[in-house]
Regions:
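Active-/binding-site microenvironments in catalytic and ligand-binding cores
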Residues: 1-223
Length: 223
């Protein structure tokens, strides 16, 4: 790992205070010889998770029907610093901020300076200044050929059903996956890097908790 920098972009989960379903039952199968196992009762959208097309349509692909390369690759991190609170991210904003760095098969993480933890009671209140996505945002990303879109705390995918549904429709129909509840993006030192986020290979899963890891400085995955 010489000359490489590794950043964990995952939410660490504590079942005692997690708001989404997360229950663990630990038991000893070995009697006098300790042999502990754990039954996990989890929801598929727990913590940092990758959502697959099956999440949005019963006829689209689940986590096992996508190639493993859908869950790793070259990533471009875009943090919008010049857009007003509660603005929509439009194609011209993406063109300007991406600086020609986004191509077919890339991963894109969208973020802004207007940060708020997602999926809380503060969502869509006066405190929520995050940027919005819409149909036009999705079309630009689709036309670029990206394979994954991730979201930092500065971009909302909860503002209204029309925008959120259109965003899913346009991208997931093309087998684009989504990365949600990303953490520690402020620890990144580069805007282009290698990213991996492998799901559990369980047939029928629409989404899976993932350990998202950025590797900076890997040859072939730089600007």
């Amino acid at each position: 790992m010489k000359n490489l920098r590794v950043v964990d972009l995952s939410k660490h989960i504590d079942p005692s205070n997690e708001t989404r379903r997360c229950k663990l039952h630990r038991f000893n199968t070995g009697g006098p010889i300790p042999d502990f196992h754990t039954n996990m009762d989890l929801m598929s959208h727990l913590g940092t998770h990758v959502e697959c097309p099956y999440h949005h349509n019963n006829n689209w692909k689940d986590v096992t029907e996508l190639p493993v390369t859908s869950f790793m690759g070259r990533c471009v991190y875009i943090e919008f610093s010049d857009l007003e609170p509660n603005s929509y991210i439009m194609p011209e904003d993406l063109e300007r901020a991406s600086k020609g760095r986004i191509g077919k098969g890339d991963i894109v993480i969208l973020d802004s300076k207007h940060k708020l933890e997602p999926f809380t009671e503060k969502t869509n209140t006066e405190e929520d200044k995050r940027l919005f996505i819409c149909h036009d945002t999705a079309e630009w990303l689709r036309d670029k050929g990206v394979k994954c879109v991730g979201f930092g705390d500065g971009v909302s995918i909860e503002n209204n059903n029309v925008d959120v549904c259109a965003f899913h429709d346009v991208l997931m129909e093309k087998d684009v996956v989504f990365l949600e509840v990303l953490k520690n993006l402020d620890q990144l030192k580069k805007e282009v890097f290698f990213l991996t986020y492998l799901p559990l290979p369980i047939k029928g899963l629409d989404s899976s908790p993932v350990r998202v890891v950025a590797i900076e400085g890997l040859a072939g995955f730089e600007e």
